[in-house]
Amino acid sequence: MNSVRFSIMLLMVLLVASSMSYALTADEIIDQANQASYYSGKDGRAMVKMTITAKGGDVRVREFTQLRYNEENGDQKFYTYFKAPADVYKMAYLVWKNIGRDDDRWLWLPALNLKKRIAPGDKRTSFVGSDFLYEDVSGRSPEEDVHTLVEETDTVYRIDNVPKDPGSVEFSHYVVDINKSTFLPMIAHYYDHRGNKYREVEALNVEEIQGFATVTVSEARDLASGSVTRNEFSDVEYNIGLNSRIFTERFLRRPPREVQ
């Protein structure tokens, strides 16, 4: 009898130990979320319709093409080319996402014949007048924050993220819900230094495209101003064989055929 009881207890201990050994840490969850959000395939392309709606109801629409290229070392390159409306036509935005150091960002303003470098300190400012930020285009590096798993349900991991350099950002922390099946962040709540929630970014629709879970509708909300920006992604493609040479400054002025 004692031997049976001992065997049952041993089995229970082993099962608990086994489940603990497979439990993901907050850092591992965030790393997988970063991969799911920004690294699907070797490269990618999408058409984007951006709708900016002010609190009073005024609506502005922007249409652009986004390209992404993954380097073998984890670095990435992003190219955004604006097609409409007329005031942003032929404007281009280039990002070199660098692992372990500040990203490089350039904005081409054809109306002014001006190539503008976006300083690292400006990465969390408005992207072309929308409620999305420059940093949202290429993603925030997981290394910039301390991550804590604060809740786990059957469907999501809830992670609290605190910046390692509080003076470099406008938020005190943000809480993100990550889908346990796809590892896509579904909603992020941003809090200011007084503890008030002032911003939300949410994935409103997810589809499987070429085997990759893909956000096809996302929304950023400025809770202080009441402004809302919705991005609708279409014609999404992965592994299309993009050439890294198009992700250079010379193609800011001369957009490659891949975006036209």
Residue ranges, per PLM feature:
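Bacterial N-terminal signal peptides
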Residues: 7-18
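A short, amphipathic edge element
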Residues: 27-28, 60-62, 136-148, 195-200
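Short, ordered beta-strand-loop transition motifs
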Residues: 70-76, 149-156, 208-211
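Sec/Tat signal peptide C-region and signal peptidase I cleavage site
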Residues: 19-23
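N-terminal mature ectodomain segment of secretory-pathway/periplasmic proteins
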Residues: 26-111
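Short, low-complexity, Pro/Ser/Thr/Gly-rich segments in the mature regions of secreted, periplasmic
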Residues: 248-259
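Positively charged n-region of N-terminal signal peptides that target proteins for export
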Residues: 1-6
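Gly/Pro-enriched, hydrophobic low-complexity segments
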Residues: 83, 94, 104-108, 114-117, ...
